[in-house]
């Protein structure tokens, strides 16, 4: 009889923990990654959304000048 109770508890622990960790862990990272947070420490922050598009436009615009497009821009 005691062996029967042990088998019932083992099958209920792994299945209940796996379903509870997979449900709340998959939606947040998947929804946050689609917003635009590849180089941010916080995958779910209101500031991360603003830094993604703002940094993306300032990075290529500022790097385009002294990068290798206009040698006159580097001297100025």
UniProtKB/Swiss-Prot annotation:
<keyword id="KW-0417">Keratinization</keyword>
<dbReference type="GO" id="GO:0005938">
    <property type="term" value="C:cell cortex"/>
</dbReference>
<dbReference type="GO" id="GO:0031424">
    <property type="term" value="P:keratinization"/>
</dbReference>
<comment type="function">
    <text>Cross-linked envelope protein of keratinocytes. Involved in UV-induced cornification.</text>
</comment>
<keyword id="KW-0963">Cytoplasm</keyword>
<comment type="similarity">
    <text>Belongs to the cornifin (SPRR) family.</text>
</comment>
<feature type="region of interest" description="Disordered">
    <location>
        <begin position="38"/>
        <end position="76"/>
    </location>
</feature>
<protein>
    <recommendedName>
        <fullName>Small proline-rich protein 4</fullName>
    </recommendedName>
</protein>
